[in-house]
Amino acid sequence: MEVLNLKNIGVRGVNSALHDVPEDRKENFEILNPQGQHSIACGINAPLNVKVKGHVGFYCGGMNKHAKIIIYGHAGVGVGENMMSGYIHVKGDTSESAGATAHGGLLVIEGNTSSRCGISMK
């Protein structure tokens, strides 16, 4: 399992590492110290397993294709926004618009969610 410390490499570094994996490879990643940063693990287009250890900000896992993302904390606005396939599991609560424009995949929220959850799913 590759460990990505967001505090050290930033959101761009984390997302670049996730995007650099070829579409046909399945790898495991653990993201540490998300500290409520926005746009973590967005645009993944490979069957990755991603564990985010902590709370995330807006749009975590947005535009997901194929990846399994587990968030061990709460998520801000728009988690799983425009998800095409894959799986996102939030172990805490989410803000509004969770999975609002998802076209596929599965979004699981163990806690509570706010308004507009799945409002425009296809």
Question: Which functions belong to the PLM regions below?
Answer:
Residues 1-122:
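Long, distal/terminal scaffolding or interaction modules
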